[in-house]
């Protein structure tokens, strides 16, 4: 079912409002908004869809952080609208030459080896760039790393990414970084 941009904005605002109400009632208010799945991918590519989502967040609670796929439209638009933004990369997904996720139908779309995924994350953070399946690097802000829970071995991968990232990245910080 397709929605108009206005309908999308209102639906997102409603969902954020409901999530805020329930989470606040439970004593754990949400702090960020992340579009999931197809909507997240659409906010990466479409300035219009990203704008509708960002307008909804800004209207409901402009203090919420917008967690966006690195290098996408949503990240840029959220910043232009004065929202707090954080760019996210995926430990378990491959990137094409444009910096977007490789289709799950293609080879290289899903990374399954926890050690390789963790080492790649360290390289990307150090380079400040997304590593594509060809080995090229595309500049990107990297402030969050996601491991999809439905990836085989997701728990092990997340643990490995955390361990290797902490060990390798923390060891290279200077006193000014701390």
What are these regions (language model features)?
Residues 1-9, 43-44, 100-112:
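Glycine-rich tight-turn/loop motif centered on a GG-T
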Residues 1-25:
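Glycine/small-residue-rich loop that forms an oxyanion/phosphate-binding "nest" at active or ligand-binding sites
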Residues 33, 147:
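Conserved, mostly hydrophobic/aromatic
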Residues 154-166:
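C-terminal helical cap(s) of enzyme catalytic domains, especially alpha/beta-barrels
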Residues 167-174:
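Conserved small/polar residues in nucleotide/adenosyl-binding loops
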């Amino acid at each position: 079912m397709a929605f108009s941009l206005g309908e999308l904005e209102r639906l997102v605002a409603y969902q954020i409002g409901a999530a805020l109400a329930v989470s606040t009632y439970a004593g754990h208010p949400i702090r960020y908004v992340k579009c999931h799945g197809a909507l997240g991918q659409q906010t990466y590519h479409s300035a219009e869809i990203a704008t509708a989502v960002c307008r909804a967040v800004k209207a409901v609670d402009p203090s919420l952080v917008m967690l966006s796929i690195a290098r996408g439209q949503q990240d840029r638009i959220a910043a232009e609208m004065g929202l707090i933004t954080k760019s996210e990369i995926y430990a378990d997904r491959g990137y094409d030459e444009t910096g977007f996720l490789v289709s799950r139908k293609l080879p290289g779309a899903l990374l399954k080896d926890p050690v390789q995924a963790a080492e790649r994350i360290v390289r990307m953070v150090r380079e400040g760039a997304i590593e594509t399946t060809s080995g090229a690097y595309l500049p990107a802000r990297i402030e969050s790393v996601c491991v999809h829970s439905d990836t085989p071995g997701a728990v092990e991968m997340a643990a490995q990414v955390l361990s290797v990232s902490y060990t390798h990245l923390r060891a290279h910080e200077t006193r000014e970084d701390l």
